[in-house]
Curated annotation (Swiss-Prot):
The gene is lpxC. The active site is at H266. This is UDP-3-O-acyl-N-acetylglucosamine deacetylase. It catalyses: a UDP-3-O-[(3R)-3-hydroxyacyl]-N-acetyl-alpha-D-glucosamine + H2O = a UDP-3-O-[(3R)-3-hydroxyacyl]-alpha-D-glucosamine + acetate. Its EC number is 3.5.1.108. Its cofactor is Zn(2+). One of its GO terms (cellular component) is membrane.
């Protein structure tokens, strides 16, 4: 049987908020079966819980933010969400003492390491997957994204289109058959990126106050400004794919199907996920309860193998 997963023990870390620039404390706590991923604002009295849910994604400007009906928010959840997807973690309490998850190094890599350090616990009930049954597509001008049936796990086909000298030298198209180990080794270290020309405006809007060359790839009009350069030759499209994995895991379940997108971002990813969940004929919930069943997605293991 393919079982639900949580952590074996509590994990604590600190980091900087991407938009606030403030220190943020982060704690992962194991959760019972069928809890889902629950974010908790511990700086509020009483504490406020926000369950990872496509319907609670109410802000997608520069990040994915969960916002409840009272306006309480937790921002920048997408990189952590991608790490959770790669490890197949179904149930977890994520506690933060600020309105956002710390950005760490701008990728999913530190979150994978932290989660692994807590150990992965397989639980008593079967893991539930969302299987795509028919094509669903959303568009916004020339940008679009779609789901389609695919019987061999989760395939992603993503293309970006940035006009810039650095991007012109890169492959801006990526096809990726999702597995946890491949994600950890080939995708997870891809960092968020931005342009110097936008930073002054962002700061005027109280955004990206914690952004730096330590947690983002920054470009001027001609080149990458980070001394160490890029982590992957195609780091930009890989980060967009990382974002999409995190955004789509807002349904609290791994998806079995094909995701294809052109110039997508947080808003379109969420729009597609909402469109899917709103159409009961487009998907079904499946489990693999046979004793010898193999998971259609190979999740990253529990050994600390990341360098």
């Amino acid at each position: 049987m393919i079982r639900q997963r949580t952590l074996k023990q509590l994990v604590h870390a600190t980091g900087v908020g991407l938009h606030s620039g403030r220190k943020v404390s982060l704690t992962f706590r194991p959760a019972p079966v069928n809890t889902g991923i629950v974010y908790v604002r511990t700086d509020l009295q009483p504490e406020v819980e926000l369950r990872a849910d496509a319907q609670f994604v109410r802000d997608t400007v520069l990040c994915t933010a969960l916002v409840n009906e009272q306006g309480v928010r937790i921002s920048t959840v997408e990189h952590l969400s991608a790490a959770l997807a790669s490890l197949g973690i179904d149930n977890l309490y994520v506690e933060v003492d600020a309105p956002e998850v710390p950005v760490m190094d701008g990728s999913a890599h530190p979150f994978i390491y932290l989660l692994q350090s807590g150990g992965i616990e397989e639980q008593s009930l079967p893991k539930q997957f969302i299987r795509i049954k028919k094509k669903i597509r959303v568009e916004d001008g020339d940008k679009w994204a779609e789901f389609a049936p695919y019987r061999r796990g989760f395939r992603m086909d993503l293309q970006i289109d940035f006009r810039h000298p650095v991007f012109d030298k890169q492959n801006q198209h990526l096809v990726f058959d999702f597995s946890g180990s491949k994600f950890a080794k080939e995708i997870s270290r891809a960092r968020t990126f931005g342009f110097m020309k936008d930073i002054e405006y962002l700061h005027s809007q109280n955004l990206a106050l914690g952004g730096s060359l330590d947690n983002a790839v920054v470009l001027d009009d001609y080149r990458v400004l980070n001394e160490e350069g890029l982590r992957y030759e195609d780091e930009f499209v890989k980060h967009k794919l990382l974002d999409a994995i995190g955004d789509l895991y807002m349904c609290n379940h791994s998806i079995l199907g094909q995701f294809t997108a052109y110039k997508t971002g947080h808003a379109i990813n969420n729009k597609l996920l909402r469109a899917l969940l709103a159409d009961a004929e487009a998907w079904e919930m499946v489990t693999f309860e046979e004793e010898a069943a193999k998971s259609p997605i190979a999740y990253f293991g529990t050994k600390l193998v990341l360098a």
